[in-house]
Each structure stands twice: as structure tokens, then as C-alpha cells.
């Protein structure tokens, strides 16, 4: 009984194993037949004689995600959300240039009238180039070129030095009294003067004498003692003769500035440590690429805007601030007849939007392929205008308050661009506020966030470009490339911590992010509009956002004709009005101007140099090399196959099997020769759609029409 039962069990197990072997053999045969079949894996054959297909799913690859739940590009990555992308782009465009250049241009170029050429240049030059860069980055999902890469490196090196200054100020603001609020420090000179309207009134009420250092001497015996013998009486504040304590603190204590460019001096190790902290923050923010950077902007960008608004409201409550706003924003319409004003407006538009620095291309390259970047450009442009106006209002209210305190007419106040405005004028106004250290901490936190929000994405531009150039070796080692680049840039930035560092920083800022960006914009616009084809580019935009940007003819004319002409006009304005530049009272020598021109022309020289290298590496006769040089690379287009299949289905292996004829003597599963009748009788499946919208029932691929190369690409 037990024997028969065990024998029956063995029989059933052997039958089961036999059936399993038959099923596995059948499955392997079916897989082999399916692999040799002409039908793609995402389609199911309905009838061999009438080849029609139904979709069983999207084309999927191990590096792609089509369910909108994760990253589309599993290798390169994408933004976690559209909010991350928009805040990052907003933080990138809200650079320090908006704060330290726009108010100055309004001051010298017609006050409120300057906003008119600024808006015009934004519309006809800034907006089109921003749209072009966002579209290029999102379409190709790759990094930038060599010329833009070099400019990005220079900007990143010296801009992080400004962040180091802000960190130095931040740490020294954690005191009960701000060190730049008085003239009693060891770094102050005889010309340092403190003038406070309330202190003067109190001193006069007590029949006292106000000294340069801001102290009031009531007793005449005290006035003639040894401590006050070297101090003169301050009867009024003369801007040309007296120096604000914030200016001496910045030049003598923070920078330890020398008297000329070639007097390097020693390294200020306090600044070197602050610079190291700035680069460590950049490394931590970009440790996980755009994933971590996208989260940092939630704090950095939003906090910067909140602090900017809070400081503006606080300064607006002070006496004289409203007079400053009225004075500086009062339009002087005759300035619009000066072409220099229009050139300055165009330069400021490029500087404010951070165009042609590569950051916008990199930010857009991490977006999803079908993100509506047409909506993004309007959001960024409106935010840029509002931010510029708010930054100008902050500066003008501070200047009005300072002029009231110093009893100086507003039109006599010497407003200067650059570090003078950010690290001298505004800190001087903040030092006169009640509980000044709290506002100083807020202000320098804002400056640090503004600078790092820009430099971290410039840094990501550099790192991603290097990784995209060598994807097999470096893309999986993004952090190593980031660490090495941060260390290299820190080493290159240490010379800016010397006594002559401010002179070199001003030189780099004067020559790098100005007219070279306009030249890059010109070549970029010409290459896209005239070489690649503006119609092709607009088709690519439609491919991504599923409609042509309205109005179609406007963008076509802008990119093809207006933008190149505007860029050439801007260059002529800038170059014709060029004069040797200065910092404070120091005039740069001729050799320094030559060095600046060399630094500015080096990235521009990379454009013809790289073209020459490409031409020499090409094969064939001269006309063929020239043609190949002007044609896109074979891998140009969307990075993911799922997106290429939307417009060029024959480029994708699975889609190619769907549309191209199968090899000769191919049999279906029922043994019928699907190639019976020859290639001339082969028609596309009725549901297979080509890039021009025609279906298989409407087009026939002839052997005479497709060359062997065309059978492989079929574009």
C-alpha cells in the first residue's frame, strides 16, 4: 500500500517534471521565435497576412521612467519637482549683480527713466536668449560648451570670494556693537568721521564740541588732553574730505588693502578660512547634485526675499528714506537720447539674468522633457524686474536715510557700483539702526544666500559639463569631480585673499561677465537660427511643449534678425565708450588693462579654436568637412530613447523593427513568409506613425528610396 502510493507519487512527480520540461521548452521556443520575429516586444501580432499591431505598453529601458513617479533619466537625474526647478532658476538669476549694479545704473542713467530701456532690452534681447538657453538645455539634456565653461569658472572663483567677505562680516556682526559703527578702532585713520544728527543735537544742547570720531567733549579741559589733541572739530560732514567708518573697516580690516595692484602683500588667513567655509558649503549643497541643491533653495531663496523685504520696510520707516526713493526714481527723460544708457541697460539685463553663463542651460537640462519652459521664461522675467526694483528701493531708502543723518544733500552723495554699495553704503546705514547687530546678521545672511544660490549652480554647470563630456568614467563619480573642482577653485581663489585681491577681483568682474557674454549670445543666436535653423529649433520646442510658442513669427524674427543686430549694437556701445577703469581712487595701469582684455578674449577665442579642431578631425574633402561641421552630431536630440521615439521612431531599435521591412525569408509564427511579394509590396503597419504624421497605410518604403545607411537611421 505504501509502496504503490509512493510509486504513484513518483509517477506524478515525473509527469510534473515532464510537463515542466515541455513548458520550459515551449517557453524558450516562444522566446526564441519572439526574438526572431519581426514584431517588436511592445506590440502584439493580430494577423500575419494583415500586419496590424496593438500596443502592450511603452518602450521601456532600464535608465528611463515613463510613469512620472521618479526621474525620467535614471543616470543623469531630474529635478524632484517643478517648484525645485523654478526656485533654483530664480535663485540663480537673483545674483549679487542685481543688488550692486542696478541701483548704480539707475543713479547715473536717468533715475526712473532707466527702467524704460531696461524693460525694452529685456524684451528684445534678454527674454529671447533666456528662452533659447532653457530650450536648448531641456531638449538635449547636456552641458555647455568650452567658451561658456571658461567664463563660468572665472565667475565661480571670484564670486565665492565675495561670499567669503559676507561670511567674515556675518561672524563679526555677532557683537553688541558693530565694529564698523565707530572710528575708535585701531584700523581707523585721521579722516574717519562719524556724523549722527541726534548726537550732534545732544552735543550742541550741552554746549559741547563734536570731534571727528563722533565723541562729544563738554569740558574744555577734556578737549585739550592728550587723547583728543590729534582730533579736530567736526562742524559738518564733508563727503569729499571725510571717510565713513564702514569704508575704513572694509578696506583696512577686512581686505587689508594695499595701495596698488602689484603690491600683493600677505594672505589674510581670516579671509582664507572664510573662503574655505564658502567652498565647503558649495560642496555640501551639491553633494547629491540637483536633488540636494533643489532643497537648499527652499531656504536660501525664500529667506533672501523675506529678508530683503523686511530690511526695505524697516529702512522705509526711517527719516529721509522716502526722499531718497523720490530722488533716485524721479525720471530724467532726456537720458533716453543717450545711446550709452541703452547699452548699459542691455549689459545689466545680461548680468541680472545670468545669461550665457551656462547656468540656465544646466538648470533646464535636469527638467523633464515635456516641461513647459515657455511659461517659465515669463515667470523668471517678471521676478527679475520686480527683484531689481525692490533692490534699488532698498539702496535708495538707505541712501536717503544716510544723507538725512549726515545732513548732506542727496545729489552730492557719491553712489558707486560693486562692493562699495554692498559692503560700505548698506552696512553704514544698518549700523545707525537700533539693535543694529540683529539687522546686520539678517543682511549678511541674505548676501550669503544670494551669492551661494548663484555660485552653486554655476559650479553644478561646470561639474555636469565635465561629467557629460566623459560619461563612462566620470558620471558615476560626480562627487569626486565636485570635490576636486572645489579644491582647485579654492586654491585659485586664495590669491584673492591677499592685500591686492580686491584689485584682481574688480578686474575679473569688469571684464568677464560683461561684453564677452554678449559675444557668446551673438554666436549662440547665429548658430541656432542660421546654422541649425530657426524652424528646426521651433519644431524642437513644439516637440517638448506640444505647441509653437505664440506668436510663432515673433520668435522667428527675434532669433534670426533682431537679436543678432541688437547684440552687435550693444557691443558697439560698450566698446566705443570704453575707458580705463578704476577702483576708488586707484587707476589701473596699462598692463592690467591688457591682462583684463586677455582674460575676456580667451573664452571667445575658444569658439574658432574648437571649430578648427573639429574641422581638422573630420574626414573627407574640404566641402564635406565643412558640411559635417555645420551639421548636428548623430546623438543630438533628446537624451532618452522614449522621447526620440515620439518624433523619430526609426531611430529606436524597437520602433525600427516596427516600421522597417523585416529581413528576407522571415517567417511568422504560422510559417507564412511575411516578405512574400518583395520589398515593393511591403507596407507599414497601419498603426505605425512616422515623424511627419503619416501612417503605414499611406506610405511605402521602396528599396530604391532607402540606402543601407538610411535603413539603419531612417531619419
PLM regions and their residue ranges:
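A generic transmembrane alpha-helix motif of multi-pass inner-membrane proteins
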Residues: 494-496, 506-529, 551-668, 715
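Extracellular/lumenal N-termini and interhelical loops of multi-pass eukaryotic membrane proteins
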Residues: 163-263, 321-334, 405-428, 520-522, ...
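Hydrophobic alpha-helical segments and their helix-loop junctions in multi-pass secondary transporters
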Residues: 129, 160-164, 168-177, 305-328, ...
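Membrane-embedded translocation segments of transport machinery
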Residues: 43-79, 86, 290, 294-459, ...
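Membrane-interface "cap" regions at the ends of multi-pass membrane proteins
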Residues: 2-100, 129-134, 192, 201-204, ...
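Transmembrane helix-loop boundary segments of multi-pass membrane transporters
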Residues: 103-121, 137-141, 148, 291-300, ...
Amino acid at each position: 500500500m505504501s509502496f504503490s502510493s509512493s510509486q504513484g507519487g513518483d509517477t506524478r512527480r515525473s509527469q510534473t517534471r515532464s510537463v515542466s520540461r515541455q513548458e520550459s521548452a515551449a517557453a524558450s521556443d516562444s522566446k526564441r521565435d519572439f526574438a526572431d520575429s519581426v514584431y517588436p516586444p511592445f506590440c502584439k501580432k493580430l494577423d500575419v497576412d494583415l500586419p496590424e499591431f496593438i500596443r502592450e505598453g511603452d518602450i521601456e529601458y532600464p535608465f528611463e521612467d515613463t510613469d512620472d513617479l521618479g526621474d525620467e533619466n535614471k543616470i543623469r537625474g531630474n529635478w524632484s519637482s517643478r517648484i525645485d526647478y523654478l526656485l533654483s532658476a530664480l535663485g540663480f538669476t537673483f545674483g549679487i549683480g542685481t543688488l550692486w549694479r542696478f541701483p548704480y545704473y539707475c543713479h547715473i542713467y536717468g533715475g526712473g527713466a532707466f527702467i524704460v530701456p531696461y524693460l525694452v532690452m529685456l524684451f528684445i534681447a534678454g527674454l529671447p536668449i533666456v528662452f533659447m538657453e532653457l530650450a536648448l538645455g531641456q531638449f538635449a539634456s547636456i552641458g555647455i560648451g568650452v567658451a561658456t565653461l571658461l567664463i563660468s569658472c572665472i565667475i565661480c572663483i571670484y564670486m565665492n570670494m565675495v561670499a567669503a567677505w559676507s561670511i567674515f562680516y556675518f561672524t563679526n556682526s555677532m557683537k553688541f556693537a558693530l565694529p564698523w559703527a565707530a572710528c575708535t578702532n585701531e584700523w581707523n585713520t585721521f579722516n574717519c568721521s562719524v556724523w549722527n544728527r541726534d548726537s550732534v543735537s545732544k552735543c550742541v544742547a550741552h554746549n559741547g564740541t563734536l570731534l571727528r570720531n563722533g565723541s562729544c567733549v563738554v569740558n574744555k579741559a577734556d578737549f585739550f588732553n592728550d587723547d583728543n589733541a590729534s582730533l579736530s572739530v567736526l562742524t559738518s560732514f564733508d563727503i569729499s574730505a571725510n571717510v565713513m567708518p564702514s569704508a575704513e573697516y572694509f578696506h583696512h580690516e577686512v581686505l587689508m588693502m594695499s595701495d596698488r595692484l602689484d603690491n600683493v602683500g600677505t594672505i589674510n588667513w581670516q579671509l582664507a578660512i572664510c573662503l574655505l567655509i564658502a567652498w565647503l558649503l558649495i560642496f555640501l549643497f551639491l553633494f547629491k547634485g540637483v536633488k540636494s541643491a533643489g532643497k537648499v533653495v527652499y531656504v536660501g531663496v525664500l529667506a533672501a526675499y523675506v529678508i530683503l523685504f523686511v530690511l526695505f520696510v524697516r529702512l522705509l520707516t526711517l527719516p529721509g528714506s522716502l526722499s531718497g526713493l523720490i530722488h533716485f526714481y524721479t525720471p530724467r527723460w532726456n537720458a533716453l537720447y543717450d545711446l550709452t544708457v541703452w547699452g548699459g541697460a542691455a549689459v545689466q539685463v545680461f548680468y541680472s539674468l545670468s545669461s550665457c553663463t551656462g547656468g540656465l542651460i544646466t538648470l533646464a537640462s535636469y527638467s523633464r522633457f515635456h516641461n513647459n519652459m515657455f511659461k517659465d521664461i515669463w515667470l523668471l522675467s517678471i521676478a527679475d524686474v520686480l527683484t531689481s526694483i525692490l533692490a534699488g528701493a532698498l539702496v535708495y531708502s538707505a541712501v536717503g536715510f544716510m544723507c538725512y543723518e549726515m545732513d548732506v544733500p542727496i545729489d552730492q552723495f557719491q553712489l558707486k557700483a560693486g562692493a562699495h554699495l554692498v559692503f560700505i553704503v548698506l552696512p553704514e546705514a544698518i549700523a545707525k539702526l537700533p539693535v543694529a547687530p540683529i539687522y546686520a546678521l539678517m543682511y549678511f545672511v541674505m548676501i550669503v544666500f544670494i551669492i551661494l544660490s548663484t555660485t552653486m549652480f554655476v559650479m553644478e554647470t561646470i561639474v555636469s559639463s565635465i561629467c557629460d563630456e566623459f560619461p563612462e568614467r566620470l558620471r558615476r563619480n560626480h562627487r569626486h569631480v565636485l570635490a576636486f573642482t572645489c579644491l582647485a577653485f579654492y586654491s585659485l581663489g586664495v590669491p584673492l585673499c591677499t592685500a591686492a585681491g580686491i584689485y584682481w577681483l574688480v578686474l575679473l568682474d569688469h571684464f568677464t561677465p560683461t561684453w564677452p557674454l554678449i559675444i557668446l549670445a551673438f554666436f549662440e543666436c547665429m548658430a541656432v537660427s542660421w546654422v541649425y535653423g530657426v524652424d528646426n529649433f521651433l519644431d524642437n520646442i513644439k516637440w517638448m511643449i506640444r505647441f509653437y510658442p505664440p506668436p510663432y513669427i515673433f520668435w522667428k524674427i527675434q532669433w534670426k534678425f533682431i537679436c543678432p543686430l541688437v547684440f552687435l549694437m550693444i557691443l558697439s556701445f560698450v566698446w566705443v565708450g570704453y575707458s580705463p577703469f578704476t577702483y576708488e581712487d586707484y587707476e589701473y595701469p596699462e598692463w592690467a588693462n591688457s591682462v583684463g582684455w586677455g582674460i575676456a578674449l580667451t573664452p571667445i577665442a575658444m569658439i574658432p579654436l574648437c571649430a578648427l579642431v573639429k574641422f581638422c578631425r573630420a574626414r573627407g574633402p574640404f566641402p564635406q568637412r565643412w558640411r559635417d561641421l555645420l551639421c548636428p552630431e548623430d546623438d543630438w536630440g533628446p537624451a532618452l530613447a522614449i522621447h526620440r521615439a515620439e518624433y523619430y521612431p526609426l531611430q529606436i531599435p524597437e520602433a525600427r523593427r516596427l516600421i522597417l521591412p523585416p529581413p528576407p525569408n522571415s517567417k511568422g509564427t504560422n510559417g507564412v513568409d511575411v516578405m512574400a511579394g518583395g520589398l515593393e509590396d511591403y507596407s507599414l503597419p497601419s498603426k505605425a506613425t512616422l515623424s511627419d504624421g503619416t501612417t503605414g497605410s499611406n506610405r511605402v518604403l521602396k528599396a530604391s528610396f532607402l540606402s543601407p545607411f538610411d535603413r539603419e537611421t531612417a531619419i
